[in-house]
Curated annotation (Swiss-Prot):
Entry annotated with the keyword Lyase: no
Organism: Mus musculus (Mouse)
InterPro entries (alphabetical): L1_C, L1_dsRBD, L1_RRM_dom, Transposase_22
PTM-bearing positions, type Phosphoserine: 136, 407, 409, 442, 478, 490, 559, 567
Annotated gene: L1td1
The name this protein goes by in its record: LINE-1 type transposase domain-containing protein 1
Chain residue ranges for the region called Disordered: 1-30, 90-200, 338-397
Domain of life according to the entry: Eukaryota
Keywords from the UniProt entry: Phosphoprotein
């Protein structure tokens, strides 16, 4: 078992590593472009594909894990761990809550399972020489120990406890009697009245199917109940198909989809079953499970979930077993040695599979377990002549099983007998197999073996005591019978069924004993190897499919990617060109900025020079209009004194100081039409201002009868700036606005009793635009 688990763990680890390596390789090949170059839509599709791959791998892992768990659970009792965990608690509860002899124990109805006995079906495939003979008492003890453990676990969950019977030691008779009395009370607890005379016992026979079969058949539970209430004679076949009669015609359905299609044409059935059909079916997970042929009900926890639903009544029947004419186990063994008619059964029962039951909180269906052994070494020695018959019949597979249960009350005996006869006619010559089972004898206070077989069983049963009859056939006969018509029955997929052992579970007084597990056989090893190979092939196929899908996506988008790549190259080249141009413009702007700054600095420097020059010339006056010949005869200083005496007599008393006077420029230009200016420098700026003020007051200034003009000596820049106001000053002066120039080149004039000052012509034009009178006067000035 540890070898199988280690193989499964190693296989899972290798698979994860392989998936990780393949994913990295695919990612490296598919994402050849940078993330920034791939459009968002492609990345979303690729991410969605990777998520789908992850989901698919996860579902495959769960599916294969369930397969391996199912295979391992067949070799190990699923209730072993639960028994070990609850040993301490349940032993104390069993001792403290053990009922007294004769006390009636109340049972809690779970709806699906009430102290049932598991009918274990296993196939006998090994030959006689491979069987391992075991002592008959050991086989009985082991079987009873298993049944006792399962029943004890069930009572522990329901809050009940019963006496324990130890079959290992024959000397503990008082303990056995107390346990037998408790067991008799437990069997009388169900709602059905006990059989008359107290000689019988109520058994529940449960067909043991795999968890996957129960998961598939669970969908029929409510449909079966509703059809049964309407007396439509539903029948659950072994292949989990639903059959019932409607309008006098038998109908067989294998799934709910076919039943839904049929009921859509029958208003009565559609109204009856409208609450049964599931509303939402499908989904990716169900689709994958159908493709892989697996279900999630094959695990131990899912098996518990299945057992908790209302499906159990389809496979479990309670029967009453008559016990007045039964024989003890020892007597039965001696009779089988002497009777030739029972030799065939003796050979078929050489290998008895022990039941392996799984505990659940609400009742459960048992897991199939097998333990090879014989009834006793003495029986094997006495049945050497029967081994040939057994070896020839052991290879025959049971193709069909039908459980025919008689009615549970005397009022339904006739109807059930007719129905049973009718069902037997549909079996197409199936074999009737004798079998034996253990029942509790309340009189003898012990378990006795009861053997029934075909017609003999019917003769030994009294009225009102139903018995179990098994019909077996080979696969070829069952296939032939199944092809006759709608009355045919389908074969179950249980592997090589050969025995049916109704076993009354006994309980043990001492500790729980965990049965020893056997090493995996060659067939199981081959099965494990085949499972691993199938897993590898499935993973490889999925990876190849994903690779094909990725290649397909790459082929679809490769042209678009190439176009986008070329477009990106063009955009990159264009961006480079634009970047170069922008760089050039930035360089030009930087150069212009530098030039602007240089010009600004030059302007500032010029302003500073102009201001200095104007300050240096602040005490100078220019005399304009004196002819050149006058300069030769008289000096410039004398000319200025003569002008002051002639025009400004009031200034003679103020003692104006004339520092210097000369014509500018120094050189004489023969082509010059006007005479050169005489530059007069006074001792102070105040003297200059008194002379200019007197010249403004006297409108006309002359020198020896010729008209001259006196102005302040300014720098060339200041003179150019003031020259823009010449035309405006003339017009304003004619209109009487008294215009004047303020230093360095500002226009000032009186308007409506206020002095208006303007720094440039644009500001002056904006002002006169709101005054129509001035606007009309200055319209011609640009």
């Amino acid at each position: 078992m540890s070898g199988v688990q280690s193989k499964a763990a190693r296989l899972q680890k290798e698979r994860k590593e392989k998936l990780s390596a393949d994913r990295e390789r695919k990612t490296a090949t598919s994402l050849c472009l940078k993330h920034s170059e791939v459009p968002a839509s492609m990345m979303k599709q690729f991410n969605a594909l990777m998520e789908m791959q992850e989901v698919m791998f996860a579902e495959m892992r769960e599916t294969y894990k369930n397969d391996i768990k199912e295979m391992l659970l067949k070799r190990t009792a699923p209730w072993v761990k639960h028994l070990e965990e609850r040993i301490g608690q349940q032993e104390g509860d069993a001792i403290s809550e053990r009922p007294k002899p004769g006390e009636k124990v109340e049972e809690l109805s779970s709806g699906t399972d009430e102290d049932t006995e598991n009918l274990t079906v296993r196939s006998k495939k090994g030959k006689q020489d491979k069987a391992k003979p075991l002592n008959s008492s050991h086989v009985l003890k082991s079987s009873l120990e298993r049944g006792g453990e399962a029943l004890r676990g069930e009572h522990g969950r329901c809050g009940e406890s019963s006496s324990l019977v130890d079959w290992k030691n024959a000397n503990e008779k008082p303990a056995r009697e107390a346990s037998c009395q408790s067991e008799e009370n437990r069997l009388k607890a169900p709602k059905e009245s006990p059989p008359e005379g107290g000689a019988g016992a109520t058994l529940r026979l449960a067909a043991d199917f795999s968890a996957a079969t129960l998961d598939v058949g669970r969908q029929w539970s409510q449909v079966f109940r509703l059809l049964k209430e309407k007396e439509l004679e539903p029948e659950l076949q072994c292949s989990v198909k639903l059959a019932f009669k409607c309008d006098g015609e038998a109908n067989v359905f294998s799934d709910l989809h076919s039943l839904r299609q049929f009921t859509s044409r029958k208003p009565f059935l559609r109204e009856l079953l409208k609450d049964v059909f599931p509303q939402n079916e499908g989904g990716r997970r169900n689709e994958l499970r159908e493709r892989l042929g697996k279900t999630l009900g094959d695990t131990k926890h899912e098996a518990r979930r299945i057992a908790s639903d209302s499906l159990s009544f389809l496979f479990i029947k309670e029967v009453e077993v008559a016990s007045p004419e039964v024989k003890t186990y020892k007597e039965e063994t001696l009779d089988r040695k002497n009777k030739g008619t029972l030799k065939k059964q003796e050979g078929e029962e050489e290998e008895i599979s022990e039941t392996q039951g799984e505990e659940t909180s609400e009742g459960e269906t048992s897991e199939l377990g097998e333990e090879e052994g014989s009834e006793s070494e003495e029986e094997e020695e006495s049945s050497e002549s029967e081994e040939e018959e057994e070896s020839s019949e052991s290879a025959e597979e049971i193709g069909f099983i039908s459980l025919v249960v008689d009615s549970e009350s005397e009022e339904e005996v006739n109807r059930k007998t007719a129905s049973q006869t009718k069902k037997k006619e549909t079996f197409h010559g199936l074999k009737e197999l004798a079998f034996s089972y253990l029942v509790w004898d309340s009189k003898k206070k012990k378990l006795v073996r009861c053997q029934e077989g075909g017609a003999a069983a019917a003769s030994t049963q009294r009225i009102g005591m139903p018995c179990l009859t098994l019909y077996l056939t080979s696969p070829s006969e069952s296939l032939g019978a199944g092809s006759d018509g709608p009355k045919s029955h389908s074969c179950t997929k249980l592997s090589a069924l050969s025995q049916v052992t109704p076993l009354l579970t006994n309980i043990e007084k001492g500790r729980y004993k965990v049965p020893q597990t056997e090493e995996p056989t060659a067939k199981e090893a081959d099965l494990i190897l085949e499972t691993e190979e199938n897993f590898k092939r499935g993973v490889i196929s999925v990876i190849r499919q994903m690779q094909r899908e990725v290649d397909k996506i790459k082929n679809i988008y490769v042209s678009d990617v190439l176009n986008m790549k070329s477009s990106l190259d063009d955009l990159n080249s264009l961006a480079c060109t634009i970047e170069a141009r922008v760089s050039e413009q930035e360089d030009a702007v930087e150069g212009l900025t530098k030039d602007t700054m240089q010009l600004a600095r030059e302007i500032v420097d010029k302003e500073r020079l102009r201001e200095r020059e104007d300050r240096f010339r602040s005490s100078n006056i220019r005399v304009i209009g004196i002819p050149e010949k006058e300069n030769r005869e008289n000096g410039a200083v004398d000319i200025i004194k003569e002008v002051i005496e002639e025009n400004f007599a009031e200034l003679e008393d103020q003692s104006l100081e004339i520092v210097s006077a000369h014509r500018v420029p120094n050189s004489v230009d023969e082509h010059r039409l006007t005479p050169r200016h005489i530059l007069v420098k006074f001792g102070s700026a105040s003297d200059k201002q008194r002379v200019l003020k007197a010249s403004r007051a006297k409108q006309e200034i002359t020198y020896r009868g010729s008209k001259i003009r006196l102005t302040a000596d300014l720098s060339p820049g200041t003179i150019d700036a003031r020259s823009q106001w010449c035309g405006i000053i003339k017009i304003l002066q004619d209109e009487g606005f008294q215009p004047r120039i303020l230093y360095p080149a500002k226009l000032a004039f009186d308007f409506k009793g206020k002095t208006k000052i303007f720094f440039d012509i644009e500001e002056f034009k904006k002002f006169i635009s709101d005054i129509p009178y001035l606007k009309d006067l200055l319209n011609n000035i640009h």
